[in-house]
Amino acid sequence: MASFSLSILVFFFSALVLVPQGFAEYYLYPAYRPPQTKPPVNKPSHKEPPVNKPPHKEPPVHKPPHKDPPVNKPPQKESPVHKPPRKESPTHRHPPAEDNIHF
């Protein structure tokens, strides 16, 4: 029985030496730390409804019509243009009385 307890003792001792973190070390969750800043609060955006305004129009401004100042120019005489007398085509003439069939 002494050899059995001695072998178990050697086994546990070698396990403590060979395993770097040891048996007592197990995973611990990180300690709770309160946040340094407050999280942003999601507030609904408060937008006022648009106000229906008529479009801004400038009032009409009365402007007198623009008149050019009179310019004193001597009257210009048109040069006479020679036009040949107008000749009527023979189709527009009245037929002679003897060829007229209308009474």
Curated annotation (Swiss-Prot):
Root nodules. Residues 34-103 are annotated as: Disordered. Its main location: secreted. Induction: By soluble compounds from rhizobium (in cells through which the infection thread is migrating and also in cells that do not yet contain an infection thread). Residues 1-24 form the signal peptide. Sequence repeats lie at residues 34-38, 39-43, 44-48, 49-53, 54-58, 59-63, 64-68, 69-73, 74-78, 79-83, 84-88. InterPro entries: Proline-rich_CW_protein. GO terms for cellular component: extracellular region. Residues 45-103 have a biased composition (Basic and acidic residues). Residues 34-88 are annotated as: 11 X 5 AA approximate tandem repeats of P-P-[QVHR]-[TNKH]-[KED]. The keyword Transit peptide does not apply. One of its GO terms (biological process) is nodulation. The keyword Secreted applies. Keywords: Cell wall, Nodulation, Repeat, Secreted, Signal. It is found in: Secreted, Cell wall. Involved in the infection process during the plant-rhizobium interaction. Belongs to the plant proline-rich protein superfamily. ENOD12 family. This is Early nodulin-12. It comes from Medicago truncatula. The gene is ENOD12.
